[in-house]
Regions:
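Bacterial N-terminal signal peptides that target proteins for export
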Residues: 1-8
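Intrinsically disordered, low-complexity serine/threonine-rich segments
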Residues: 9-10, 328
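Charged, low-complexity surface segments at secondary-structure and domain boundaries
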Residues: 10-11, 25
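C-terminal segment of classical bacterial N-terminal signal peptides
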Residues: 13-20
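Mature extracellular/passenger domains of Gram-negative fimbrial/pilin and adhesin proteins
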Residues: 22-353
Length: 353
């Protein structure tokens, strides 16, 4: 009997860590939703003048609705939700490196898994057996995400904003086709690490379609006017904005195809105005944070930030494309304008295809 008791005790002790490892579930959309999502890279091209270390493709902004629940870790402890980049290190392409831009920060899918805090905290399911008053009497406020026993969340739903990208780690030869197919770039899981069980209910985001990449023997150059790449709205008062409604400045981007003896490929380009700042009006306005907002116009139509659209076609005889834009500054609805200098950064990005 002593041997049997000892054996059973050992089994229980070794089983406990496994139970904790399976503690957190995360789904696409609502609780019980899908746990697999795939982004297929649309066909795109690498210009001949691309540089090692440069991003050669980016997705549009991807806004993923994530719901996490089932925190049953021991000790009634809360759990932080993490986005794990490169959760399953595996064979990679010799020329291309995958990555994720999460909340404006780049994470390469190389080496060991890289945990990114989503700033979402999940209260323990088991703590709900106690009333808020009982939790206070036990001094367990520190086991509640908010520190308030009246504000317990055993389910969290949030929107993860990310972009997928491909970076060059070595210049591929003309005509190269990648053999890398499906790759998991992100998994939503607990702070403790990646749940690799086959039946894990942890949302995984896949990327595939690297075989759609074409290596060009041509490229293009860009010239931005004004040449300092700064748009200066000058000095003005809040009253000026109220009276005039908007202040406008123009700028332009000229793109020239590099046509040399080696260039035999035609190609197209998509462009995007990219920002990490807060957006409004269906992502057509950047909120500067001082009561003002910025739009970029094509004629009178506003561009949607962080979304790619067709920009230039060099499949024919055309060698140059010049596009004029208007930067429009106006008052943010319902906000008072704060005086003082300000700046915001918007990047012009290109995908070849």
């Amino acid at each position: 009997m002593r041997k049997l008791a000892s054996f059973l005790l050992t089994l229980l002790l070794t089983a406990l860590p496994l139970k904790e490892a399976l503690a957190l579930n995360c789904y696409l959309g609502g609780s019980g939703g899908p746990v697999e999502e795939t982004k297929t890279i649309s066909p795109f091209a690498i210009p001949s003048n691309a540089q090692v270390g440069q991003k050669i493709w980016e997705s549009d902004d991807i806004k993923i609705p994530v719901t996490c629940d089932n925190n049953v870790t021991s000790g009634f402890k809360p759990e932080d939700v993490f986005a794990w980049v490169n959760p399953y290190p595996a064979a990679t392409d010799p020329y291309y490196e995958l990555g994720v831009t999460y909340e404006g920060i780049d994470y390469d899918a190389t080496g060991q898994p890289n945990g990114v805090d989503t700033r979402q905290c999940l209260d323990n399911d088991n703590i709900t057996i106690y009333t808020p008053d009982q939790i206070r009497q036990m001094g367990w406020e520190n086991r509640i995400c908010s520190g308030n026993p009246d504000d317990i969340h055993i389910t969290r739903t949030f929107v993860a904003r990310l972009r997928l990208f491909v970076r060059i780690k070595a210049m591929p030869p003309h005509g190269y086709v990648s053999s890398l197919s499906d790759y998991i770039v992100v998994q939503f899981d607990g702070k403790g690490g990646v749940n690799q069980m086959a039946d894990a209910k942890n949302l995984k985001y896949h990327i595939n379609g690297l075989q759609n990449i074409t290596v060009l023997d041509c490229g293009a150059t860009f010239t931005i006017y004004p040449e300092n790449q700064e748009i200066d709205f000058g000095t003005f008062s809040a009253r000026d904005i109220v009276n005039q409604q908007t202040r406008m400045r123009t700028f332009s981007i000229r793109t020239t195809k590099v046509q040399d003896a080696q260039c035999s490929d035609g190609f197209k380009m998509d462009s995007s105005f990219y920002t990490t700042e807060t957006l409004s009006a269906d992502d057509t306005a950047v909120l500067i944070g001082n009561g003002l907002k910025l739009r970029i116009l094509n004629g009178t139509a506003p561009y949607t930030f962080n979304q790619y659209k067709e920009y230039a076609d060099f499949t024919g005889d055309k060698m140059n494309v010049e596009q004029n834009y208007t930067a429009e500054l106006s008052r943010e609805e319902g906000k008072a304008i704060q005086s003082g200098p300000f700046e915001t950064v918007v990047l012009f990005k290109i995908n070849y295809h």
